[in-house]
From Swiss-Prot:
UniProt key word Ribosomal protein: yes
Gene that produces this protein: rpmJ
PANTHER family, alphabetized: 50S RIBOSOMAL PROTEIN L36 2, LARGE RIBOSOMAL SUBUNIT PROTEIN BL36B
UniProt name for this protein: Large ribosomal subunit protein bL36
NCBIfam families to which the protein is assigned, alphabetical: PRK00831.1, rpmJ_bact
GO cellular component, one term: ribosome
Ribonucleoprotein as UniProt keyword: yes
Family annotation (Pfam families): Ribosomal_L36 (PF00444)
């Protein structure tokens, strides 16, 4: 799965790609060709402690 800052190109890679939102993150899933999976964002604030 790729982690991208923008999913605009990722959703246009294949005609079966679809954008879904799960747990506050945006994913591109493609059941017919799973190598096109992608997720937007990845950096989260870590706790100091």
């Amino acid at each position: 799965m790729q982690v991208l800052s923008s999913l605009k190109e990722a959703k246009l890679r294949h005609r079966d790609c679809q954008v879904v939102r799960r747990r506050g993150r945006i994913y591109v899933i493609c059941k017919s060709n799973p190598r096109f999976k992608a997720r937007q964002g990845g950096a989260r604030n870590r706790r100091k402690g």
